[in-house]
């Protein structure tokens, strides 16, 4: 599937977080798409997925929800990191590249992660499923 938005042109192919040895989750982004955000934490714990949950905390407006998500991480025994100086999708991509690299992925709904990621895959959550995103070369006709 091809997607064009204000962030660029992207090629999306179906993929699954289970194809990666570790995933870095942009919590605010993914949780916002769920009717019950707690499902994100409960299902990850139940499935035993190796995940790092990256929580936006870089602006005071994030702090209340960030605390709620940190509490859920603790309740389910999950690895959570606060992103205190940049958006979580950028920090997740940075952490993924630094700690894991190839064979790992960032899970988000934000296409900025595609630009920020180096060696890690970026899976965009869209239409209830995950899609591996690659930015298309803007010099190619399209």
Residue locations for each model-derived region?
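Acidic, polar low-complexity linker/tail segments
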Residues: 1-19
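Nuclease catalytic cores that cleave nucleic-acid phosphodiester bonds
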Residues: 13-14, 19-23, 30, 38-142
